[in-house]
């Protein structure tokens, strides 16, 4: 069991200090406007506390992935829209369209106490001036980490969503600065998820969806030891159903994961894994985009002919009923991954019914970020859960009981 006993904001003398904060402002942007500012809002508690401590505050974040010079020169992945949003929420916010070099050093020097400076997308450093993909941020370049660390007295990691990665903007800074701590958001995340890994109230029920078994393999293996039931839907159930010898038509699955799926099912001696066995399907040959696929019919995987022209896009009524019966008895619940193509009204029912059942239960319930959080928001049910994590991959890594490098790098109490 991993217990993170890390310094928090309250454990460090921050008065009048220059503080560099890794935030997660990786938000959706359309037409140069932020269309969902949840992550910006969630960072405000930490930023406002630092303002109260009379700090000079430097903010770092990534936005999307940077794969070419075009990604930079087009400014489509610039944090400027984030700055425009942030300055409606805070006074004294500045933005610099750079994050390394002389201008950055000067801008930080000129910062006044209680001012906030947002630097440009950290991943601009993943491509050099010649267009070569060098991944200085994503591969934790020591030189980059040292530069950012040199700007401040204290480093605060408040980006839970990237804490499962060792980047220059989290691990790199922490390794090169004399004081580091976690922010309020990361603190909340660790406390909320720890309730599921440290003696959870039982029954402890896990619902896993999404497309790939490969993404969830480690978490399934870990949760087989700690959970009472693991309910599996979404695209990943196709690989398990295929491994059981059921027919899945033309549904997407991972051929390279079939043997692993068989092994997991064989190791499940206590029958903790409950698979969605009926699904809502549509004619595979007519699908151009799953998000606009027409309504289909319900089929049971074990009854279908092998080469039938169908693709499963949601769990069916029987599976919904079975899953809801386990959810009703649960005292702790972790949900990661939608159970169908919830963006399509014809295939949102599985995710909606399960989200609604969890929201109505008396259990301690956590959504593990990512698409399941997006689904809960779409159904206007997110506020009915005990906690909604900001990190899909990071929450899974935490539930795997694997070390989160971005947290591990922070000084212990």
Curated annotation (Swiss-Prot):
Cellular component GO terms, alphabetical: cytosol
Pfam families: PGK
Biological or metabolic pathway of the protein: Carbohydrate degradation; glycolysis; pyruvate from D-glyceraldehyde 3-phosphate: step 2/5
Binding locations of substrate: 24-26, 39, 62-65, 123, 165
GO biological process: gluconeogenesis; glycolytic process
UniProt subcellular location: Cytoplasm
Keywords, alphabetical: ATP-binding, Cytoplasm, Glycolysis, Kinase, Nucleotide-binding, Transferase
Domain of life: Bacteria
KW Translocase (keyword) present: no
Positions that bind ATP: 216, 343, 369-372
PANTHER family for this protein: PHOSPHOGLYCERATE KINASE, PHOSPHOGLYCERATE KINASE 1, CHLOROPLASTIC-RELATED
Complex formation: Monomer.
Protein name listed in UniProt: Phosphoglycerate kinase
Gene of this entry: pgk
